[in-house]
Amino acid sequence: AYVKKGIPQDRSNLKPAVTPGGIIESEVQKFVLDTVVAGLEVPWGMAFLPDGRMLISERRGTLHVFSDGKLSPPLGGLPSIMAIGQGGLLDICLHPDYSNNGWIYFSYSALDRESPRPAGNTAIMRAKLKGDRLTDQQIIYKGTPGTDRNYHFGCKIAFDNKGHIFFGIGDR
């Protein structure tokens, strides 16, 4: 269980930590916060396609394309995702040679449909985007055993300059 202290029961008067248009300063840089995409619940990862469109993953298990100021409906072709607690659809990353091979990699909490309770584990899948859905899905990693604990799934993805994939998996 998690213990959160100091959070009032009535949260209607709480203000955001930073407001859009507000300036955030660090020791070396100033940033301006601006909303680029609205209508997302918990956006987790994003990747820019060569044509300028942006793929956005949401923890709740949806993947969208953002283009010309518009957010697409959720794309089809995703695997079964355990979108509970800290689990869900997590990072997304294009293969370094995406322009030639079309591979998109994403991390997620894979739902174990055989378990009597919602259970799963961290997984990495790659797929190709065709129209409004993912195709050619291939699971390249899935942690075992599954767990019914809904936290610590990781999972960022990166490639080195030789095309090797690296990912963090948390406790899973």
Regions found by a protein language model. Give the residues of each.
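Acidic, Gly/Ser/Thr-rich repeat motifs that build Ca2+-stabilized beta-propeller blades
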Residues: 1-172
